């Protein structure tokens, strides 16, 4: 059954969302819910990313699915906030049916997931500044696509995978990354992924999942947790910077996303962006033309 187009499946998905919304809205500190995690991966087309039981859909069908899920939640919880979680294929793969347009128009805010193990780390290598600039680049890319300059941003996933960030550099990686984010216009929240390491008693996880936490699986804070605690007050006090430099431009189709691959971390645009960020100490703007 197709996860995005089959009427029975969509009915079941909508019902789950309605029931969750009905229960969660009773909690005094709950403000909304996210459909995730990276559900559009089931429609992915990129080599190496294609799901073994892929659910094929068109761009219009992806749009309909997003709207259906959003409406199910809003019907039950009108005052709640609703988000979607997208992996970065959405920003970089030309023929992905989920497009940047979807990310910047659906839900309460634009969410970004930043992982350096996929493309940035393999291209630039351990310790390269591109790794700590990558989350900010994604946020600037999201801003470039958005028709609303005031649309909120949420860096929903960012972490220090030990495949490219060794233990002795994890704390510095975290503080440098967070420093690059603090001045981002519209950024409302950052979620460091994740809270705790996965226990080695749990088998069959990818190796990097066992060491992503701010805490060990028994609750001991790791160096990056202690470093984060120290910088949080500064992060709260930092103000977004008005970016005056001329933006770096790229061309991509609003409706289909065709051309978005030029923004990939394997391309020249990202290299130019990182070089300028390192030279000036400020994140360059991006502009879609």
Where are these regions (language model features)?
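Conserved, mostly hydrophobic/aromatic
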Residues: 20, 33, 73, 110, ...
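Active-site mouth of glycoside hydrolases
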Residues: 1-102
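The substrate-binding groove and active-site-proximal loops of carbohydrate-active enzymes
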Residues: 2-12, 39, 51-62, 121-133, ...
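Aromatic-rich peripheral "rim/lid" segments of glycoside hydrolase catalytic domains that contact
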Residues: 8, 13, 184-289
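Histidine/acidic-residue-rich catalytic or RNA/ligand-binding cores of hydrolases
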Residues: 164-178, 202-209
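Generic structural signal for well-ordered alpha-helices
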Residues: 14-21, 63-71, 135-143, 174, ...
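Glycoside hydrolase catalytic-domain groove-lining segments
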Residues: 59-60, 75-163
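Core-facing hydrophobic residues within beta-strands of well-ordered domains
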Residues: 27-30, 107, 187
């Amino acid at each position: 059954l197709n996860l995005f187009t089959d009427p029975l499946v969509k009915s079941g998905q909508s019902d789950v969302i309605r029931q969750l919304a009905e229960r969660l809205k009773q909690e005094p500190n709950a403000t909304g819910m996210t459909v995730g995690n990276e559900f559009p991966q089931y429609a992915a087309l990129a080599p190496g990313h294609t799901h073994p039981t892929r659910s094929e859909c068109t761009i219009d069908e992806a749009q309909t699915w997003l709207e259906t899920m959003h409406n199910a939640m809003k019907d039950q919880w009108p005052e709640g906030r609703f988000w979607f979680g997208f992996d970065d294929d959405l920003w970089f793969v030309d023929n992905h049916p989920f497009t940047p347009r979807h990310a910047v128009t659906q839900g309460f805010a634009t969410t970004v997931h930043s992982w350096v193990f996929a493309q940035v780390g393999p291209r630039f290598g351990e310790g390269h500044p591109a790794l700590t600039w990558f989350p900010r680049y994604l946020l600037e890319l999201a801003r470039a696509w958005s028709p609303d300059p005031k649309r909120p941003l949420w860096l929903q996933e960012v972490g220090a995978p030990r495949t490219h960030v060794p233990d002795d550099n994890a704390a510095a990686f975290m503080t440098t990354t967070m420093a690059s984010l603090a001045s981002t216009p519209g950024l409302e929240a950052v979620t460091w992924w994740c809270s705790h390491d996965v226990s080695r008693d749990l088998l069959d996880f990818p190796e990097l999942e066992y060491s992503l936490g701010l805490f060990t699986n028994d609750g001991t804070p790791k160096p990056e947790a202690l470093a984060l605690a120290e910088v949080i007050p500064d992060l709260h006090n930092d103000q977004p910077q008005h970016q005056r430099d001329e933006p770096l431009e790229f061309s991509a189709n609003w409706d289909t996303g065709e051309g978005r691959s030029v923004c990939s971390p394997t391309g020249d645009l990202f290299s130019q962006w990182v070089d300028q960020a390192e030279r000036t100490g400020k994140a360059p703007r991006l502009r879609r033309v």
